[in-house]
Amino acid sequence: MKTLIARHKAGEHIGICSVCSAHPLVIEAALAFDRNSTRKVLIEATSNQVNQFGGYTGMTPADFREFVFAIADKVGFARERIILGGDHLGPNCWQQENVDAAMEKSVELVKAYVRAGFSKIHLDASMSCAGDPIPLAPETVAERAAVLCFAAESVATDCQREQLSYVIGTEVPVPGGEASAIQSVHITHVEDAANTLRTHQKAFIARGLTEALTRVIAIVVQPGVEFDHSNIIHYQPQEAQALAQWIENTRMVYEAHSTDYQTRTAYWELVRDHFAILKVGPALTFALREAIFALAQIEQELIAPENRSGCLAVIEEVMLDEPQYWKKYYRTGFNDSLLDIRYSLSDRIRYYWPHSRIKNSVETMMVNLQGVDIPLGMISQYLPKQFERIQSGELSAIPHQLIMDKIYDVLRAYRYGCAE
């Protein structure tokens, strides 16, 4: 990460896409996409997804590392080209607890990530805990971030410190996505970004972390990009020029969250304006969902009724029976809920792919389609971009490859923006 940031600060148009997903097919796609390049791939886990207690994936940081490395070995992607990051590391998962208990767990969380070899650490102590004022004072956020940084430094080896990098910043979207419709978004003011940096510098120095400050590579701000279930707020470069100019006088770049669904031109403009770390998650699993839904429609027409997976029906049944991952995000009417379950850009389906019933139905569908020749006309109908690539000889009409290429479409836009 430090090398990439140095190149960007030296004037090169270069950025990196941060893949925020624990889905094996998304990780496989991210690694396979860059297998034949010289680029490094940044894969991040969030604190609620992966933590010392397992998170909602059931994986500790060490488990996640091995999970990613196993996929890399299968794909033929060199492990040393993978950068592992931890996102929203702090009290995010324990906001209902008092600050002492929440921070104690947060310290162990950060230590677990660093011990597992994660080298990009987002120190995010912006969440209020039980009894805290809402919002927290910037000084309090910075002091807690310094506690987390101290924890990271205390377990890092000398070799790890050479690679270790920190991201600071409090102006981040709700981890997991917006819960309501959006019409506009607040772009970070320069004075707020400057205050975030100033308060963190003061807090770090007070804890004897002056050297660690040199490892702070980025600050999280809101450049004016966001999405909800069916709306996308697109990047308006002219609105972020004050931010773009301010960061030029520092050693850092910006990290932009929720960049999903922007145009490839917007990604290029974001990187030009020093938002050099572009985080993406739901757009990748949304592309995966689109591919699976398309294949399910193809299966419906090609496979005898008694042998079909019933994949789409199974997904709806499970999500309606177990609504905990979407209930507080989606609309309440039955028809509206079904539309959101299927097609929301927030893509809460991503939390359900590991469910045994859904996983088994998808596997059945894949086996069914591997045993038949999919007519080109059907691929043109349901996966038109993939049809074009099949016609040009770039792609085969194999279900797994069709899913991979659908995810590649998202990664292609980021590659264009991050140029190298």
UniProtKB/Swiss-Prot annotation:
GO terms for cellular component: plasma membrane. It comes from the Bacteria. Keywords: Galactitol metabolism. SUPFAM superfamilies: Aldolase. Pathway: Carbohydrate metabolism; D-tagatose 6-phosphate degradation; D-glyceraldehyde 3-phosphate and glycerone phosphate from D-tagatose 6-phosphate: step 2/2. One of its GO terms (biological process) is D-tagatose 6-phosphate catabolic process. Pfam families: GatZ_KbaZ-like. InterPro entries: Aldolase_TIM, GatZ/KbaZ-like, GatZ_KbaZ_carbometab, TagBP_ald_GatZ. Belongs to the GatZ/KbaZ family. GatZ subfamily. Component of the tagatose-1,6-bisphosphate aldolase GatYZ that is required for full activity and stability of the Y subunit. Could have a chaperone-like function for the proper and stable folding of GatY. When expressed alone, GatZ does not show any aldolase activity. Is involved in the catabolism of galactitol. Forms a complex with GatY. This is D-tagatose-1,6-bisphosphate aldolase subunit GatZ. It comes from Escherichia coli O157:H7.
